[in-house]
């Protein structure tokens, strides 16, 4: 009797779609594999739009963050089109630093399009997409977004018409500040040296040794600080993963399983918190699932913490 009552309640469709979950969201914390060197894995994202365009006509910021060094490149733009994203990626990164091995973006049309697909495929760049409404997948950029937006708000005028004038200075300050996790500045990790600040006093002329001596020294320095930063980051990831995963379910779904999907867009007080049931049609590891709505035929990728299992109701005769 107890088991049948428990199953009857757990399998209630309306309850599953509307109830507030009082437990931790499912899914263990799994970090993206840390690259061995800088500028191998990049994260790119758009921020905006601001309420009104600046006097220069800009409403968006496009941001590129290196996964290992945390080095940031950012520009203010009037739009968030595929053309703007592709032009920024080529002119501001590839023509300066070469092609990365992997690029991670969201699944918006400004990144998921024929133009950027042609660029990445021609340069042998693996282009990975974060799942819908799950910014944690592209968390490197999201963390910088939170940092620089607050700084822009403090410096721009009350009409917010000149915010883009301060963007380069804020990016420079970020790149030359010691990162709390890596314990080095992003600039130092990216280029194996500290930048000369505009406020530094004039120093005597530095005489460098011959290139055949200095270059091996520079390479050794890069290897040492990169290895140290990787150790610091991996230690931090391990520590927080252990804390996050404690007492947290890590469900695994299989193709054919029925699930509800968390509603992440605007909803009113009486709207369902989850939609479905939908069916899992493809898996990617243990955290990302391609889910299909059989009524509309629409498919989309979701993170495991956006899914809720459908409990089959037992029938007793």
Regions found by a protein language model. Give the residues of each.
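An active-site-proximal beta-strand-loop segment
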Residues: 37-72, 266
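Amphipathic alpha-helical
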Residues: 1-39, 233-240
């Amino acid at each position: 009797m107890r088991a049948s009552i428990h199953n009857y309640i757990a399998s209630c469709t309306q309850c599953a779609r509307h109830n507030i979950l009082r437990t931790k969201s499912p899914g263990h914390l799994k970090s993206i594999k840390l690259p061995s060197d800088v500028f191998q894995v990049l994260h790119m994202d758009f921020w905006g739009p601001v309420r009104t365009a600046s006097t220069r006509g800009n409403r968006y910021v496009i941001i590129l963050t290196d996964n290992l060094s945390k080095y940031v490149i950012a520009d203010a733009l009037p739009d968030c089109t595929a053309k703007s994203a592709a032009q920024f990626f080529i002119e501001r990164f590839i023509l300066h630093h070469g092609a990365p091995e992997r690029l991670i973006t969201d699944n918006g049309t400004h990144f998921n399009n024929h133009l950027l697909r042609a660029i990445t495929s021609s340069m042998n760049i693996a282009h990975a997409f974060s799942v819908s409404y799950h910014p944690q997948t592209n968390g490197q950029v999201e963390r910088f977004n939170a940092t620089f937006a607050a700084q822009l708000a403090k410096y721009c005028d009350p009409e917010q018409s000149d915010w883009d004038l301060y963007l380069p200075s804020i990016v420079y300050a970020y790149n030359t500040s010691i990162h709390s996790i890596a314990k080095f500045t992003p600039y130092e990790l990216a280029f194996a040296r500290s930048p000369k600040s505009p406020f530094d006093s004039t120093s005597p002329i530095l005489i460098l040794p011959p290139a055949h001596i200095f270059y091996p020294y520079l390479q050794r320095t890069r290897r040492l600080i990169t290895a140290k930063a990787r150790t610091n980051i991996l230690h931090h990831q391990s520590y927080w993963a252990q804390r996050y995963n404690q007492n947290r379910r890590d469900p695994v779904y299989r193709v054919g399983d029925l699930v509800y999907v968390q509603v992440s867009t605007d909803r009113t007080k009486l709207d369902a918190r989850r939609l479905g049931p939908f069916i899992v049609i493809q898996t990617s590891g243990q955290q990302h699932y391609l889910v299909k709505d059989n009524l509309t035929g629409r498919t989309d990728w979701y993170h495991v913490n956006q899914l809720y299992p459908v409990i089959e109701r037992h029938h007793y005769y």
